[in-house]
Amino acid sequence: MTIDYYETLSVERDADQGTIKKAYRKLAMKYHPDRNQGDKEAETLFKECTEAYEVLRDESKRRIYDTYGHEGLKNNGQRDTGGAGDIFSHFGDLFGFGGGGGRSQARRNGPIEGNDLRYDVSISFMESIQGVSKEVKLSRRETCWTCEGTGSRPGYQPQTCPTCNGRGQVLRSQGFFQVSTTCPECEGEGQVIKEPCNDCHGEGLVKKTKTVAIKIPAGVDTGARMRLRGEGEGGRRGGPSGDLFVIVHVSSHEFFERDGDTIYCRLPVSMTTAALGDTVDVPTVHGKKNLKIPAGSQSGERFTLRGEGVPSLRGRGNGDMVVELHVETPTGLCEEQKKMLRDFHSFCEEHGQHEKTKGFFAKLFDEVLGKNK
């Protein structure tokens, strides 16, 4: 659906540039993302009023729009308002940073995006499998809304730096050469603040503590990086806030190990269970499951439980769980138990049930003795 640019800014069709700028400034500050975090409607309204201002502030585009409407702009290739950087660039004009000095000065004196922040969060192994929401307290610098990020007291504007004349660079003579260096007066800003804001002391930012909700999806692993847009440091001069990068660290588990979407575990079973076979309960990350152990199973044998592994972050279902048997040798036997085992061993000897073991050692001894001859 197309929008009427004049209605969007609530101005008449014959409004002058001062009226248009004032109307946009009022709406832009009202719907600015930093003031309406998480509000999708405000974000949409902010983009719409910015699109309208992009056209109406330019007399050439405005004439085309007044004559031919949106189709005229589209056919002339002038409706593209660019990315987020272009959207926020209009704030430079609104706050009095435009004009003179070329493109580099416009960038230097225009909106400044806030710094990105990093936060390391630790979660348990089971939280990484099931997903979890965490609330963390962040101490960060946010846009000072008293001065709207300019750093100057309300009613005042930064002044052109007298040392570099707004260029942000000064020339230094070194022998026969002249070297361009950052202006020490304005520190490369091109402007100096004569009347600093009482709240931010000229920084354009104030330090605040905020609680941020972090939703960690099921299936994350150590090193996973999540990006929360707009949750970094606040911007200056109408620039957007930076982003918050959350780095996940998953604790190890005493029973489960993970490799990709596959979970491994070592299941201790008794000697009789391994010899006779049985159906046992196996703990998985999704609950208790039955595992049928065939008679004669050996230590180190592996069994796969399909779909009992880690949920895929790409939505491809769960990985598998691999169970490795660990046959436990009984300890602390009484004399009667030892006698029973000796009798059992003798019975196996008589009936040739240890032939595999005998054959293995016989082959090994022959190989070793043969080499020593």
From Swiss-Prot:
One of its GO terms (cellular component) is cytoplasm. InterPro entries: DnaJ, DnaJ_C, DnaJ_domain, HSP40/DnaJ_pept-bd, HSP_DnaJ_Cys-rich_dom, HSP_DnaJ_Cys-rich_dom_sf, J_dom_sf. Pfam families: DnaJ, DnaJ_C, DnaJ_CXXCXGXG. Binds 2 Zn(2+) ions per monomer. CDD domains: DnaJ, DnaJ_C, DnaJ_zf. SMART domains: DnaJ (SM00271). Coiled coil: none annotated. CXXCXGXG motif repeats lie at residues 144-151, 161-168, 183-190, 197-204. GO terms for molecular function: ATP binding; heat shock protein binding; unfolded protein binding; zinc ion binding. This is Chaperone protein DnaJ. It comes from Desulfotalea psychrophila (strain LSv54 / DSM 12343). The lineage of its organism: Bacteria, Pseudomonadati, Thermodesulfobacteriota, Desulfobulbia, Desulfobulbales.
